[in-house]
């Protein structure tokens, strides 16, 4: 279904130059992904322990099917950001004072719908609302390539197909990062991402070459068999072979740690996150990591050597330790919101890698890994959607501070500084509460879902003897709460630093009367004529559209009310782990 949709979009893009049908293409892709979810859901009972495809290049199991559905769902939620107009209406449109006074003011009858359309168009122009993200017809097509690469990567069973899948996913992300052609900052971020992403691919290719040189096969099943034989044989030659296989896997894993921005290979992610548009950052920060971690889970499960003196898993433990330290300490110095989220992601990757490293030693540790990955993906998605929504809601406001006026690429990334959220609670309390709940979940505050995820990881690590790393994880969680609370302080404990824009319209008003169109500082919309003034309260400027509101509400409620439905979530995780261990 994904391949058919890609071909259809390629043909459609080739025969049309209209940029305004991008929304239609996005909605078509959403429908296709919904169909994929239904198809994969119905095939879960058929696949059972696994099905090999294309001569063993792909291996489809229940665990890969479940995470395919998860990726499709996340992609749908991200695609709806560009599939619907984020602004539903203006409060003025149906205000009775406005409707009653308008005929007296202009002196003749004009249909109210025409007046509303004109005013809406003028308000978009006055307040600088930018719809560029709704006019990129290549956007859904490139997203499908990324999704296709992610699905193949999770299901691959061969070293060659691993490399091709990760490159298909990565090149789509490189193009997405530079898709806003008029943004110099976005182009710079995309170039950094491309150069360092290509460098990380060299490690993957080198590791795959060493694995082939030491095993004589590119099939993962063959590698698993050789690894299991080296476990049961105790002679020197077998140990020597196992050592080189583990060394090759270590180099192989370095490339993937680069891709997910785990420390010490994290240095590219804060710059790239901050430079590319926020909508693209959402996809880069979530989808690319899910597929890689599921592949690493399979590799860890089948290649962890209990009898060897050296295991490539030690590299994951070192990366976990460095991610916890660097993501927390460096995050304390950040004042740009997306750079802060980048370091927050690095810190959370420390927990994920810790759970991954011990995932083969007990069912509980694998369950902790899967649960943490799922909940963090949803929480991270919610934060980015809320930031995008806040950016849309602030288009009608200006800041007097000079540092805000010097921000680059403000149209594609409206919220860049933490201080831009100052006093936002007084502008939109519900959206502020949703952001606060999600941030508290990041910090691991009970009874939110993030607390239970961290508790499961720490419990699994302690049960398997990783006391030192568990202590580091606890300390970094406490310290990391500082920069999360700093965001809360800016939102709730300061007065708003925003003012509504005030604009006069001259010589372009379409009706033959003298006019003056304003958005004034008293939160009121007014139109002045020769003898009459029509005014109406504007409340908070924009009303966010229903798809945005519903998505934020559902994810926030799940995060908040997890304590009341934890059995369902944990039962689902247990079933997935049992499926994995039974294959």
Swiss-Prot record:
Ranges that cross the membrane: 28-48, 67-87, 136-156, 191-211, 247-267, 276-296, 312-332, 340-360, 380-399, 433-453, 465-485, 544-564
Keywords: Electron transport, Membrane, Mitochondrion, Mitochondrion inner membrane, NAD, Respiratory chain, Translocase, Transmembrane, Transmembrane helix, Transport, Ubiquinone
UniProt GO MF annotations: NADH dehydrogenase (ubiquinone) activity
Subcellular location: Mitochondrion inner membrane
InterPro entries linked: NADH-Q_OxRdtase_suN/2, ND/Mrp_TM
GO biological process, one term: ATP synthesis coupled electron transport
Pfam family, one: Proton_antipo_M
Catalytic activity: a ubiquinone + NADH + 5 H(+)(in) = a ubiquinol + NAD(+) + 4 H(+)(out)
UniProt GO cellular component terms: mitochondrial inner membrane
Enzyme Commission number(s) of this protein: 7.1.1.2
Disulfide bonds: none
Topology versus the membrane: Multi-pass membrane protein
Similarity comment: family membership: Belongs to the complex I subunit 2 family.
HAMAP family in the cross-refs: NDH1_NuoN_1
Function: Core subunit of the mitochondrial membrane respiratory chain NADH dehydrogenase (Complex I) that is believed to belong to the minimal assembly required for catalysis. Complex I functions in the transfer of electrons from NADH to the respiratory chain. The immediate electron acceptor for the enzyme is believed to be ubiquinone.
Protein name: NADH-ubiquinone oxidoreductase chain 2
């Amino acid at each position: 279904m994904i391949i058919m949709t890609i071909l259809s979009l390629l043909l459609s893009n080739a025969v049309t130059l209209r940029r305004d049908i991008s929304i239609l293409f996005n909605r078509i892709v959403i429908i296709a992904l919904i169909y994929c979810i239904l198809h994969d859901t119905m095939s879960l009972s058929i696949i059972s322990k696994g099905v090999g495809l294309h001569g063993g290049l792909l291996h489809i199991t229940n665990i890969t099917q479940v995470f395919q559905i998860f990726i499709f769902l996340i992609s749908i939620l991200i695609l709806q950001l560009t599939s619907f107009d984020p602004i539903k209406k203006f409060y003025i449109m149906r205000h009775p004072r406005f409707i009653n006074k308008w005929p007296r003011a202009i002196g003749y009858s004009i249909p109210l719908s025409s007046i509303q359309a004109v005013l809406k168009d003028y308000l978009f122009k006055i307040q600088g609302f930018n719809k560029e993200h709704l006019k990129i017809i290549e956007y859904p097509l490139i997203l499908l390539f990324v999704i296709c690469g992610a699905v193949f990567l999770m299901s691959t069973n061969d070293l060659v197909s691993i490399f091709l899948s990760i490159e298909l996913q990565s090149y789509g992300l490189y193009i997405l990062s530079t898709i806003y052609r008029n943004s110099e900052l976005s182009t710079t971020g995309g170039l950094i991402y491309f150069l360092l992403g290509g460098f990380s691919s060299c490690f993957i290719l080198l590791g795959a070459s060493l694995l082939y040189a030491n095993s004589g096969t590119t099939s993962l099943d063959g590698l698993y068999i050789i690894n299991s034989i080296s476990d049961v044989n105790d002679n020197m030659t077998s140990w020597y072979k196992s050592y080189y296989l583990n060394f090759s896997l270590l180099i192989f894993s370095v490339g993937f740690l680069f891709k997910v921005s785990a420390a010490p290979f994290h240095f590219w992610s804060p710059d790239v996150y901050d430079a590319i548009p926020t909508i693209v950052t959402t996809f880069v920060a979530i989808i690319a990591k899910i597929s890689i971690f599921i592949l690493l889970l399979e590799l860890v499960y089948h290649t962890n050597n209990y009898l060897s003196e050296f295991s490539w898993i030690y590299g994951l433990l070192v990366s976990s330790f460095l991610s916890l330290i660097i993501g927390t300490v460096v995050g304390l110095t950040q004042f740009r919101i997306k750079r802060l989220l980048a370091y927050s992601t690095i810190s959370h990757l420390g927990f994920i890698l810790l759970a991954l490293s011990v995932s083969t030693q007990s069912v509980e540790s694998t369950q902790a890994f899967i649960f943490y990955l799922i909940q963090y993906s949803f929480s991270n998605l919610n934060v980015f959607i809320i930031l995008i929504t806040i950016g849309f809601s602030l288009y009608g406001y200006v800041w007097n501070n000079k540092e805000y006026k010097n921000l680059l690429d403000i149209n594609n990334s409206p919220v860049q500084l933490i201080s831009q959220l100052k006093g936002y609670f007084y502008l939109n309390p519900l959206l502020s509460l949703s952001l606060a709940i999600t941030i508290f979940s990041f910090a691991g505050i009970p009874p939110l879902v993030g607390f239970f995820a961290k508790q499961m990881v720490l419990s699994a690590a302690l049960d398997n003897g990783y006391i030192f790393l568990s202590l580091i994880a606890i300390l970094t969680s406490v310290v990391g709460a500082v920069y999360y609370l700093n965001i809360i302080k800016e939102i709730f404990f300061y007065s708003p630093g925003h003012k509504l824009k005030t604009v006069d319209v001259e010589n372009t008003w379409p009706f033959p009367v003298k006019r003056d169109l304003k958005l004034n500082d008293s939160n009121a919309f007014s139109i002045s004529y020769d003898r009459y003034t029509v005014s109406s309260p504007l409340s908070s400027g924009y009303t966010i559209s229903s798809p945005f509101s519903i998505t934020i509400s559902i994810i926030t409620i799940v995060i908040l009310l997890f304590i009341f439905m934890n059995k369902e979530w944990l039962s689902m995780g247990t079933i997935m782990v049992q499926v994995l261990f039974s294959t």
